[in-house]
Amino acid sequence: MQTVNTQPHRIFRVLLPAVFSSLLLSSLTVSAASSSNDADKLYFGNNKYYLFNNVWGKDEIKGWQQTIFYNSPISMGWNWHWPSSTHSVKAYPSLVSGWHWTAGYTENSGLPIQLSSNKSITSNVTYSIKATGTYNAAYDIWFHTTDKANWDSSPTDELMIWLNDTNAGPAGDYIETVFLGDSSWNVFKGWINADNGGGWNVFSFVHTSGTNSASLNIRHFTDYLVQTKQWMSDEKYISSVEFGTEIFGGDGQIDITEWRVDVK
């Protein structure tokens, strides 16, 4: 791993509550659409999901471009141009189900769920990337102590599941390599400092060989955190499931041909 994100995208969402207002004005329900506007959302799947044009690190650089697009349930994604070689994340365009520094949760998502409920969250994703520079392809899963998370609710924990990466490395320290859900993962544990004096735990599972397709049961990972390592209480709530690309710099496009999240 060559680079570590020292200014993660999560801090942006805690520090700028004014963004909430702009998000309300830039949400679209689509059959087929695209947008290059900062923080735009394209809703689909009966509003269960949305594509989010998250460009939280844009102030670090000029001349950037990023566009999200949705054509159909088997044709969606985003492209980007971030002319930078610094070791900080510039953007996290993503697919979102549930909460994301918002007032509540997406419709029909089944979220939030308390870990003690023993429900399973399964997710499937298939994608291809053509890109240069530094980036990853990763799930981002957020936890709170409440089932009523709002736009100003700071999370207590974050679970990242890296399916692929190029020249990028997770925050925190390497702990061990584990086998979960038919795959091998390098486990990292760290802490995200927020400028408001708070912060949260971040747990990253990095696929040891990389994959462009995954069928995950999120409980495999939360059981490891709660039961095996006792790093997290089962009283916490899973608030959201995202999949996106943390982009440090470069040019590229991701095409997603399968995406779903189900709570059972």
Curated annotation (Swiss-Prot):
Enzyme kind, highest EC tier: hydrolase
Enzyme Commission identifier(s): 3.2.1.4
GO molecular function, one term: cellulase activity
Top-rank taxon: Bacteria
Any single GO BP term: cellulose catabolic process
Keywords assigned: Carbohydrate metabolism, Cellulose degradation, Glycosidase, Hydrolase, Polysaccharide degradation, Signal
Signal sequence segment: 1-32
Keyword hit for Hydrolase: yes
Reactions catalysed, as given in the entry: Endohydrolysis of (1->4)-beta-D-glucosidic linkages in cellulose, lichenin and cereal beta-D-glucans
Family membership noted in the UniProt record: Belongs to the glycosyl hydrolase 12 (cellulase H) family.
Protein name per UniProt: Endoglucanase S
Organism in which the protein naturally occurs: Pectobacterium parmentieri
